[in-house]
Amino acid sequence: MINAKQVPTADMSCQLLYISESQACQVYSLQALIAEHELSIILNVERYVDKLNQKRRQQLSQESTQPVLLLDDKNKLSWLSDGLSIAPEWDKLQRRVVSAGRKSELLLQATKMTADSKVIDATAGFGHDSLILASTGAQVTMLEQHPLMALLLLAEQQRMSTLPNWQKLMSRLHIINTDALSYFARFNNYLEADNEQAVDVVYLDPMFPEDSYQDSKTGKGAKVGKHMQALHQLVCPPTLDEEQKLLQSAQTFVSQQAQKQGRVIVKRPQFAPLLAHLEPSESWSNEAVRFDGYFV
């Protein structure tokens, strides 16, 4: 994510609703994650005893003056956004993760990941693409600027790590609450001095205007899903100047870190303009999405 509308500079308050006294350990684990990763979040914890139907979810998300988080009966943490429970839901990607390969995933064609690769997903969002990247055996560092989104990612990683079939994949994901530009500047010298940590690929999936999903001439294109609708509440599309800074810093970073040819891969809707108006070295696309590659 980039250009967050309200990335907190001080601690933000979130209401956390849980439904059972048996969830005390899970509530404590969430608070421990916040402390360990220094997230600027304060949880106002409350047990919710009434039936939490769709109408009540809608009321809670509309009436609350702070973000509302829900810990459900399966200990899945979600964010109530316009009455919808928004969560990474990594378990729903199991079939795709298991079958992921270059034949089925344009992302893997573009990144050319191997088990020895190291990649930075600099705009992690809900982490779905990070899972596909990590399915190759690669190590994936996930950067997420907004603390609320970072908490959802960390909680999902913690939950999925309890499932035996997911533990190895979860161990290859490294989630950091920071923005991409700060990370590139902060870690450049460290990575340059340690070849074992050298990065092969930087992956960017910045927010774009909602009308980018459709062809301006025909009106055809992909519909915006609930996850993307929720992100639009937290994030503004970057300005042209911000796009240029992001792409340039990513190119500079990977050119200094990669042991051989490095690449920056940018995900765009099929009909979206080029990031920073810069022509890529190569592109891969289908009917819905396009990956632009910048080789350095």
Swiss-Prot record:
This is Ribosomal RNA small subunit methyltransferase J. Its EC number is 2.1.1.242. Belongs to the methyltransferase superfamily. RsmJ family. The keyword Methyltransferase applies. It is an enzyme of class 2 (transferase). It comes from the Bacteria. Its main location: cytoplasm. The keyword ATP-binding does not apply. It is found in: Cytoplasm. Specifically methylates the guanosine in position 1516 of 16S rRNA. The gene is rsmJ. It comes from Psychrobacter arcticus (strain DSM 17307 / VKM B-2377 / 273-4).
